[in-house]
Amino acid sequence: DLASANTRARLRMTTLYAIAGSNNGIVVGTGNKVEDFGVGFFTKYGDGGVDISPLADMYKSEVYALAEAMGIAQEIQEAAPTDGLWNDGRTDEDQMGATYEELEWAMREIENSSSEPLTARQGEVLEIYWRLHNANSHKMNSIPIFKR
């Protein structure tokens, strides 16, 4: 279930901090703009718990371009994105119901709304985007505090 999957992400984060702490290092995040600020596709206090997030202002397409420019192994570049929290092979895109390319389009469409008519799939992707964005907004916003 989702609670168990999120626990795996939190244990992974704890392990990464233990390794970083033992080596005078930091934990570097891998989230991109769509995940971190669009649909909130990360575990609160799990893979979202990092010291620095160098890719967070980059769309997934930009991350792929960067990987290509850096000469990252093709096998890694072509691997289906997955959070690794499930033992059934499901990908990020299986879980979200849209591809990163589609969700990137949705973010850009919202930022720079065009007057072009939408296809049925584009309308569906916008609905997926807003559903995920709204459901996960608690992850993307600062922790609420009570003013005295």
Where on the chain are the PLM-derived regions?
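ATP/NTP-dependent adenylation/nucleotidyl-transfer catalytic domains that generate, transfer
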Residues: 1-10, 14-17, 21-26, 30-34, ...
